[in-house]
Amino acid sequence: MLNGIHHIAIICADYGKSKRFYTDVLGLEIVREVFREERRSYKLDLSLNGQYIIELFSFPDPPPRPSRPEAQGLRHLAFEVDNIENEIVKLNLKGVATEPIRTDPYTGKLFTFFADPDGLPLEIYQK
């Protein structure tokens, strides 16, 4: 049986820009970074609060993928936060634009969206 989600893999267009975004802006911690010469590709393992959650990959000339929320495939990646207003201020101060706060009609919880450097929709959802 499944125990949970182990990690999410993301292929980025600009490795340096995405690495800075996920570490400096979102605060994920680097677990391991390797360059795979045979693929001319970086693989960056990232954790959040000590839990390994994201693999960030670079590949030479990756094809673009539609990233608007209604495209097939991954719709968005959501992170839980304690205080959405505080997190929005932090993101905005680091140059990240966020959408207006919305209220989930089913749970009454607050959430908003923003995007990573490749346009992947990201969400913060208040606990």
Residue ranges and their predicted role:
Residues 21, 85-90:
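Short amphipathic alpha-helices within nucleic acid-binding modules
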Residues 1, 34, 45, 88-127:
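Vicinal oxygen chelate
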Residues 70, 77-85:
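Mid-chain, well-packed structural core segment of small domains
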Residues 49-53, 61-62, 84-85:
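Short, charged/polar surface micro-motifs in flexible loops or helix N-caps
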Residues 11-52:
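Core segments of cupin and vicinal oxygen chelate
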Residues 1-16, 74-77:
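N-terminal beta-strand motif that seeds the catalytic metal site of vicinal oxygen chelate
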Residues 4, 40-42, 73, 108:
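Exposed loop/turn and edge beta-strand positions of beta-sandwich/beta-sheet ligand-binding modules
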